[in-house]
Each structure stands twice: as structure tokens, then as C-alpha cells.
């Protein structure tokens, strides 16, 4: 399945209402076998207002290609670039990706995520979270994390968070983060926080 979207405006205002959702058909953890679903979205604006509502969401081994998007999320657990169980591949080039809700990083990775030439900003959350045997690569990006609010039982403010939750959403193993030609700003707390991975 291949879907291409260009110059669209998406707004959601319900719990669990992601802006654009790509599911590859595999419900197992980090299984590369999927139905080949690929979503390509370009030159578009995505706004989500409620909880559990990511901007672009990829699961089940799907492939998401995003180019020059303006993504804003306001709810809790609503990453601008979001992945979940089953992982997949996400490639983002250009655009602005902003979150204002608690537990809503600019990027939440249970997949292979590459972001290039983009602006990432989180107000009340970590900037980037990588869970389990997954990775995020930044190329020529700006990442700013204000991190004004702790979420749940968290006791530490942190920008780039690598961990293993044992929830089953991500395969066990070493998380990976790489940044080249990028500017990372941490307004509060640790820039890097690594635990249990």
C-alpha cells in the first residue's frame, strides 16, 4: 500500500487521533516483515489538540517519508514524530515539529528514525526519546528542549532520553542516537540521560 499526500491541512481534536498514521501490518516488536505500507507526505500542516495524538505516527513496520511539514501537538503523550509497537522506518526532511504537552517529545522512537534539516522543539517533555533497540539520527537539525514539566513518576529533567521500558513496545537492546551538524539546546536538566539499555 502506498499513499502520497501533498499540500494538505490536518487538524484533530479527539483522544488517540494522530494526524497521519502509517501501519505496516506487523504487530510484533520490531519485526521487519510487514505489508509494505508506505506513506509519503509533503508540504503540509498537521495540528493535533488532544491526548495520545501524534503528528505523524508509524507502527507495525511501516515506512513514513515526511518532507517540509509544520507539525504542532498540544496533548499529553503526543510526540510530533511518533512511533509505537512494531517499529518501522521514518525519514523526515525539513519542516518544524513542535510539542507543548507533557510526555510529548518532538521525536519518540521505537523505530529507525532519521530527521534532516528540520527544527524540533519540545516545551513540557523530553526533546527526543528512544526506547529499546531503536535509533534516532539527526542531520543538520536544531533541537530545543524547554522541559518545563515532569511527567508521571519522573524525577529528572532530560532532553535526549535512551531507555528500555520493558513494556513490550520495543525489542530489548541498545538504543542509538547520532547527531551531525546539529544544534542541541537544553533549557533544563540533562542533555543526555541513558538507563537500562
Regions of interest found by a model, annotated:
Residues 1-13, 20-49, 57-77, 82-102, ...:
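Surface-exposed loop/turn motifs in large extracellular/passenger domains
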Amino acid at each position: 500500500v502506498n499513499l502520497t499526500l501533498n499540500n494538505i491541512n490536518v487538524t484533530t481534536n479527539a483522544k488517540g487521533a494522530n494526524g497521519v498514521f502509517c501501519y505496516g501490518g506487523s504487530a510484533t516488536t520490531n519485526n521487519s516483515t510487514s505489508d509494505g505500507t508506505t506513506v509519503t507526505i509533503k508540504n503540509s500542516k498537521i495540528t493535533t489538540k488532544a491526548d495520545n495524538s501524534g503528528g505523524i505516527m508509524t507502527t507495525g513496520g511501516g515506512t513514513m517519508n515526511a518532507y517540509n511539514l509544520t507539525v504542532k501537538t498540544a496533548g499529553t503523550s503526543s510526540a510530533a514524530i511518533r512511533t509505537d509497537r512494531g517499529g518501522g522506518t521514518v525519514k523526515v526532511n525539513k519542516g518544524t515539529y513542535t510539542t507543548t504537552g507533557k510526555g510529548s517529545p518532538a521525536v519518540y522512537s521505537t523505530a529507525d528514525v532519521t530527521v534532516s534539516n528540520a527544527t524540533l522543539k519540545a516545551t513540557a517533555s523530553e526533546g527526543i526519546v528512544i526506547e529499546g533497540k531503536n535509533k534516532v539520527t539527526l542531520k543538520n537539525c536544531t533541537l530545543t528542549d524547554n522541559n518545563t514539566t515532569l511527567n508521571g513518576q519522573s524525577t529528572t529533567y532530560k532532553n535526549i532520553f535512551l531507555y528500555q521500558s520493558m513494556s513490550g513496545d520495543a525489542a530489548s537492546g541498545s538504543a542509538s542516537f547520532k547527531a551531525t551538524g546539529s544544534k542541541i539546546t537544553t533549557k533544563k536538566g540533562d542533555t543526555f540521560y541513558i538507563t537500562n539499555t
